[in-house]
Amino acid sequence: MNIAELYGKMGKHSWRIMDAIFKNLWDYEYVPLQLISSHARIGEEKARNILKYLSDLRVVQNRQKDYEGSTFTFIGLSLYSLHRLVRSGKVDAIGKLMGEGKESAVFNCYSEKFGECVVKFHKVGHTSFKKVKEKRDYGDLHFSVLAIRSARNEFRALQKLQGLAVPKVYAWEGNAVLMELIDAKELYRVRVENPDEVLDMILEEVAKFYHRGIVHGDLSQYNVLVSEEGIWIIDFPQSVEVGEEGWREILERDVRNIITYFSRTYRTEKDINSAIDRILQE
């Protein structure tokens, strides 16, 4: 998606309509037109026309069944979250798409306050959020709320881990997390010359995370970055706090995954149980 081009097509009334949708996502799967009109302080007919325009741009999805209502698409939620970052003075220019997967889309951007950085737009929520049973008058919890909670989860985890081998995190709005741009490559893309040392560095960070009360939750070769300067661990939407239900099993899985990768790729010999015990005892 060309989010910069799309951003330029939004006017003040479009943002007011999107404000109204955002504020009511927690109460409605599709926010009723009457409520959007009221919150945006725009007449219903004009609001309907703006929503049609936004739908044509794939920013919102409208429906007529049962009642007339609208909700965000992933692009729309990301666009609106970017707008909140711009409005708060955190982002001044958005760049190109750097990468996109099932869980997020990452763009480079520029901030006068923070310099060159990246903004990560979350697509889906934390696994546990998918089991939310909240019911509302107009349907179930919308995926947008799950994406927002996923972004919030990552932001809060990174805040607790600042100063360790993680990106500096600057802001969170909607489904967007603004963070430091790290010039490094994913572990699976490179051939490291000192695998035992790199593995030890990763496990040391896992131990530091644990002592700050955080378990990554999805540690693998895909979210470890390496360069000549060291290693960084990224992607924390599935992180859990130490003490949450199942945290120990999640920690053990993280350790097992990364040790198994090094064993298969570099024939390293690291005992998984001993590594886990060391993390818990340090």
UniProtKB/Swiss-Prot annotation:
The modification Phosphoserine is found at S128. Its cofactor is Mg(2+); Mn(2+). It holds the Pfam family RIO1. GO terms for molecular function: ATP binding; metal ion binding; protein serine kinase activity; protein serine/threonine kinase activity. Mg(2+) 2 binds at N223, D235. GO terms for biological process: maturation of SSU-rRNA. The keyword DNA damage does not apply. It catalyses: L-seryl-[protein] + ATP = O-phospho-L-seryl-[protein] + ADP + H(+); L-threonyl-[protein] + ATP = O-phospho-L-threonyl-[protein] + ADP + H(+). The keyword ATP-binding applies. Mg(2+). Mn(2+) is seen in the crystal structure; there are 2 Mn(2+) ions in the ATP-bound crystal and 1 Mn(2+) in the ADP-bound crystal. Keywords: ATP-binding, Kinase, Magnesium, Metal-binding, Nucleotide-binding, Phosphoprotein, Serine/threonine-protein kinase, Transferase. Its EC number is 2.7.11.1. Mg(2+) 1 binds at E103, D235. InterPro entries: Kinase-like_dom_sf, RIO2_wHTH_N, RIO_dom, RIO_kinase, Tyr_kinase_AS, WH-like_DNA-bd_sf, WH_DNA-bd_sf. Gene3D superfamilies: Phosphorylase Kinase, domain 1, Transferase(Phosphotransferase) domain 1, Winged helix-like DNA-binding domain superfamily/Winged helix DNA-binding domain. Residues 92-282 form the Protein kinase domain. Autophosphorylated. The active site is at D218 (proton acceptor). One of its GO terms (cellular component) is cytosol. ATP binds at residues 98-106, 120, 126, 180-186, 222-223, 235. Belongs to the protein kinase superfamily. RIO-type Ser/Thr kinase family. Monomer. This is RIO-type serine/threonine-protein kinase Rio2. The gene is rio2.
